[in-house]
Amino acid sequence: MALYFDHRIKAPDTPSSPSHITWHPTHPFLAVASISPSSGGNVDIYLEQGEPVPDTHIERSFQATSLCWHPTRLILAIGWETGEVIMFNKQDKEQHTVPLPHTTDIAILSWSTSGSCLVSGDKLGVLLLWRLDQRGRVQGTPLLKHEYGKALTHCIFRLPPPGEDLVQLAKAAVSGDEKALDMFNWRKSSFGSFLKTGSQEGLSFFVSLMDGTVHYVDEKGKTAQVASTDSSIQTLFYIERREALVVVTENLLLSLYVVTPEGEAEEVMKVKLSGKTGCRADITLIEGSLLVTAIGEPVLRFWDLERGENYILSLQEKFGFEKGESINCVCFCKAKGLLAAGTNKGRVAMWKKVPSFPNGRGAEGKDMWALQTPTELEGNITQIKWGSRKNLLAVSSTESVSILSEQAMSSHFHQQVAAVQISPSLVNVSFLSTGGTHSLHTDMHISGVFATKDAVAVWNGKQVAIFEPSGSTLRNAGTFLCETSVLAMHEESIYTVEPNRLQVRTWQGTVKQLLLFSETEGSPCFLDVCGTFLVAGTDLAHFKSFDLSRREAKVHCSCKNLAQLVPDVGSITSLRCNANGNKISILLSKVNNSPDSKIYIYDVEMDTVNVFNFTTGQIGQIQTLPFNEPPTNETRSFMDKSLAGYTPVNHFWDQSEPRLFVCEALQEAPGAQPQAVDKQPRVEEGTCHKEEVLILSFFASEEHGFLLHDSFPRPSTYQSLLGMEVPHYYFTKKPGEADKEDRVDSGYYHIPQMVAKRPLRDFVGLEDCDKSTRDAMLNFSFFVTIGDMDEAFKSIKLIKSEAVWENMARMCVKTQRLDVAKVCLGNMGHARGARALREAEQEPELEARVAMLAIQLGMLEEAEQLYKKCKRYDLLNKFYQASDQWQKAVEVAELHDRVHLRTTYYNYAKHLEASADCGQALSYYEKSDTHRFEVPRMLSEDLQSLELYINRMKDKTLWRWWAQYLESQAEMDTALRYYELAQDYFSLVRIHCFQGNIQKAAEIANETGDWAASYHLARQYESQDEVKQAVHFYTRAQAFNNAIRLCKENGLDDQLMNLALLSSPEDMIEAARYYEEKGEQMDRAVMLYHKAGHFSKALELAFTTQQFAALQLIAEDLDEKSDPALLARCSDFCIEHRQFEKAVELLLAAKKYHEALQLCLEQNMTITEDMAEKMTVSKDSKDMSEESRRELLEQIANCCMRQGNYHLATKKYTQAGNKLKAMRALLKSGDTEKIVFFAGVSRQKEIYIMAANYLQSLDWRKEPEIMKSIISFYTKGRALDLLAGFYDACAQVEIDEYQNYDKAHGALTEAYKCLSKAKTKNPLDQETKLAQLQSKMTLVKRFIQARRTYTEDPKESLRQCELLLEEPDLDSTIRVGDVYGFLVEHHVQMEEYQMAYKYLEEMRKRLPSANMSYYVDQRTVDTVHQGLGLLPPSRIMPERVRHNSMEDHKEVYEEVIEEVDNDP
């Protein structure tokens, strides 16, 4: 909490009354104009504590009417009632008078935004614009002059827009232009002087006149009226970011104008503000959107320009304001977020703006403002102004001026004594051990306080006063002068600070010891005492601790430099030590003076620093190492992420327990969280809200380090954390909070005045326990914190207090140890809780079971969070209902537990009904869809309301209910009307029959067809012996058995048949028996038995009565589910009547497969695939053995073969397991694709060979794939002899068709290889074939060689050819014509035509039937004949078909061999 110290200005000796006050915008100088009855008018300048600035007194015999400081320089413009304007230069103590064009009161003085020009205006409407130099002297004549003829009231300069070049440059910088960015950064660039920033003088402004008009003066000096109001203008504002002008008149008429760049104004809003008129109003604008008005009323009135909303803030008596106290003036400080207002009773009221945090919506309206403690002054406050960069507040009353400066409230807690400052010179002292409280009044403005059980010390930086308790009062035990900023006490010693040393003094100020600090260590400025240890921190971020247990203080921890322990350290903010002196906690500020979000805890014994990072929720340890090695760092999480994002502001160690540490942390301002926190996933619903202030306690141990013990939000009625001593936390209370009685149930205890305490979580109910119990509970808390529940249990097992066991049970909720919780509930005697916990064991989620424990212990918030965590929204719904949180229950049901939504609505409706809220109950009964019976019940005592509701709802069920009620009241006519609305035709018919109007009842039954109505009417007709009508309405009612009964009784046989067919099988059988017994119309009996599914009886009766048509119909409906004997009998019947297809179907249904197959053979019936499938017995069938099944399948396949259905035969042979027969059937089909596929999947040698043989019968010469398959199948079938024969045939094709002897030789080579590998039954025959192949290969090779050597040795080539011609078996291998053709071609090329002719003649003799042109080109033959002069031969040529060359057989073979080797 902050206090405001008031410093009354030291005015001149001459009595005077202040008239104007104004702060310099940046420097802490306040200008005050006052009126003196004797001397006239005065202007003085004061410092922040009210001291007058020397040589600044200005005095005239007339009054000052206007004051205005220069925006940056220490130049004050002063306007006087004579029209004189003085420029006072505070720096040089110079006065410069502006020339005198004004002749009356100066009404306005306003500096331009750059401070180079000044506008002055008087009450005659004369307006001047002056240019001044840096010392405040006027430069030449006025830049402009206007005479408006009416008194000027306000002047506001319009901020100049940035030049076009600057706008473009800004856009480029945002886009990432490095040059543009450098031009904006003056540290990196010298381009700044060249920026064309447009007209930066800002010499355009608005002025208002007494007649209510507003004029705009542009840069060129031209003036134009832009707005006009109906009365004098009281306030004028210009909102830069919206380019808008706000005008408020004396009649409180608010007008908002949008201003164009040219200065034209368009009115966009006009509204009449609330408040009394006829008196002066003080109006301020907050952040360009919120208008605040003080009009001498007890309230401040707010108007939100953006939302169009208004609200008020009132003064509250609990803060010390008087009833009827009114507010005269108001002012807002943006830096502090404080709204200050002065009252007619001399009080300064302040409202602090509540910050908006990023975890949700901020406060709105009057909830944005929190009223603070007022500052008490004197007189009627008329003016109030914030100013300077120090944010000082000047307050002017009718008699004096005071300057308020903020100072933090001092408070201290030590040895069960708490001292809290509540005003600048008043301290509230509470002796908590005895309950005594004292108000300590001093004659100084207190800047600090320190309390012990023996004395209380206060000081102000210049003087120290010691007070000790004496009976019911505090008496002064010593006062001495000492310029110390901080102070500490221990027993009878006082510790004060001076540069580079600590002074140990007596209560009277006598120095008895000096504790020195070196120049490098700095001067001590922070002190703390805990137990018998004192810790001191210096302004150079060093710290040292002392042991005070002896007569003189001894160093306990040598001086440490934080800069060596913590990187980027700024300065110390505060530091504390624990009761053992082995832990020192430190708060720091960063280098830029912003608060650090970490707490540093130095371990004296281990020489390590633990770092608590409250922003990220991490704890790290920095360990210093010897020999100047860099420190080591370790980090881990010390608290839940939901507790992250805070900044510590207070920290304390327990006064007696060295392990306990507590701190107070504020939520970081919006936008302050680092990225690491922002990346955390969103917290589960219900836990997303973050408290503004948290109290966190920790346990410290050597083995486990620092562990979070507890955390809770600081109660709203408390101001700040004051300290800690087991079993309580201590807080300062907010001023104005009324003292309240102790609330034992919530665990809060309030001490009168300013101190409050709250027990530690584990000590609720044990606040007055003895030391042994306290130690046991501390150990319990410690072990629970480290997670050792067994040790925690041992530490309290001997304690008999139920409160202790209840605390243990509460801990079990936190640790989720249900086994320990059972023991705790037993020791508490909590039978209900034990039973509930036992019943909850059936829940699968641990959190759900723990939540039940929390409910039994009254920990409802924890139970709620546990249910949310495990997402057991059904149990959460029940919890909300049981705890009377119905809105939450409904919300959960609607969003997450829709299974129980209607139940929730219903239960809520029952609750509302019990609460007598019938209107809401009715609504929720409707939502639960139970209103049709619950609302009539609920409104049964209010029939008029019920009737209105029923008529309004127009619901058939409700109409029916109301009709039944009316019928019970014998109001038949009205009941009929409502039954008709409800479309309850049964009730209509029933009432009409009751009234004897049976004809009307019959009309209704016929029109509607309602079964119940028809049945009731049929009963009526039957009772009246009107059989036909009864049968008719029984039929309409679908009550066929009753209609059949009447037909049988009354001989209505024709109707009986139709009714039986419409009725159930049982009724059909009864009707059939009726016809059978009667012996007539037996066809009807057979049909009815048939329709009823009684086939055996139908067949028997049909055979007996020779009804063949009926038999045929029955046979058509039989299937495999029918009786086999019945099927066989029907099949015989079909055979007799030559219905063979139906007979086969029946035989198959009866599973007589052989008979069905035999019938097909005998009658030459084609076996379809469907019939074949029906004849095929599954492998799992137990009706037939596997051998019989295969035999049947082969018979089916044989039959299919005879009928030419080869594919079906293949399928059945395959199913029978006879793949060879299946292949033969497939070969007969000629389906090459399926043959190849079947051979590939069968994997049998015989099938491979069969497939290959078949493929050889095809034109494999044109299809390389077929040739490849042939080679593959022969290879897989291990038929190498057949493969050799195929290669031999391939070679012959190459020779005969393509004359490709090279490929032919390759094919022969492959044939030889295959044959040589083959294992034949006749080796002699194999040897003969091999010899033949070898001979062929030799001849082909010789011919190939002869042709190849021709180019090198033609003679040798010709000789080889001639030798070949002499071979006896040449014709069987090589075409002789090819050899002769080769020789002829050679001799023709050599022009040896005679030799060529010779070989032609030999060829003719050797091949008499061949055409020569088949071997020798016809042109070659013609050339030979021409060369010899012979006639050309006949040119008749046989037709010759040329085929494409074959694939390389060797490559194909190698590819096939590879496939075979890879085939498993």
Curated annotation (Swiss-Prot):
Q: What does this protein do?
A: Component of the IFT complex A (IFT-A), a complex required for retrograde ciliary transport and entry into cilia of G protein-coupled receptors (GPCRs). Plays a pivotal role in proper development and function of ciliated cells through its role in ciliogenesis and/or cilium maintenance. Required for the development and maintenance of the outer segments of rod and cone photoreceptor cells. Plays a role in maintenance and the delivery of opsin to the outer segment of photoreceptor cells.
A single GO BP annotation from the record? heart development
Subunit (UniProt)? Component of the IFT complex A (IFT-A). IFT-A complex is divided into a core subcomplex composed of IFT122:IFT140:WDR19 which is associated with TULP3 and a peripheral subcomplex composed of IFT43:WDR35:TTC21B. Interacts (via C-terminal region) with IFT122 (via C-terminal region). Interacts with TTC25. Interacts with TTC21A.
The UniProt entry's GO CC annotations, sorted and at most eight, read: axoneme; centriole; centrosome; ciliary basal body; cilium; cone photoreceptor outer segment; intraciliary transport particle A; mitochondrion
Q: Which UniProt keywords apply?
A: Cell projection, Cilium, Cilium biogenesis/degradation, Cytoplasm, Cytoskeleton, Disease variant, Phosphoprotein, Repeat, TPR repeat, WD repeat
Q: Where are the TPR repeats?
A: 772-808, 863-896, 902-935, 956-989, 1011-1044, 1079-1112, 1124-1157, 1190-1223
| Disease link | Defects in Ift140 are the cause of cauliflower (cauli) phenotype, a mouse model for human asphyxiating thoracic dystrophy (Jeune syndrome). Embryos die at 13.5 dpc and exhibit exencephaly, anophthalmia, severely disorganized ribs with extensive exostoses, vertebral and palatal defects, agenesis/hypoplasia of the craniofacial skeleton, and polydactyly of the hindlimbs. Cilia morphology in limb buds is severely disrupted with a broader and bulbous appearance.
Q: Which protein are we looking at?
A: Intraflagellar transport protein 140 homolog
Could you tell me which residues carry Phosphoserine? S1445
| Record PANTHER family | IFT140/172-RELATED, INTRAFLAGELLAR TRANSPORT PROTEIN 140 HOMOLOG
- Any idea where this protein resides? Cytoplasm, Cytoskeleton, Cilium basal body; Cytoplasm, Cytoskeleton, Microtubule organizing center, Centrosome; Cell projection, Cilium
Q: Which SUPFAM superfamilies match?
A: NHL repeat (SSF101898), TPR-like (SSF48452), WD40 repeat-like (SSF50978)
What happens when the protein's gene is inactivated? Mice exhibit pronounced postnatal renal cyst formation and renal failure. Significant increases in expression of canonical Wnt pathway genes and mediators of Hedgehog and tissue fibrosis seen in highly cystic, but not precystic kidneys. Disrupted cilia assembly in postnatal day 5 (P5) kidneys. Mice exhibit cone cell degeneration and opsin accumulation in the plasma membrane of the inner segments of photoreceptor cells.
Q: Does the keyword ATP-binding belong to this entry?
A: no
Q: Which Pfam families match?
A: Beta-prop_IFT140_1st (PF23383), Beta-prop_IFT140_2nd (PF23385), TPR_IF140-IFT172 (PF24762), TPR_IF140_C (PF24760)
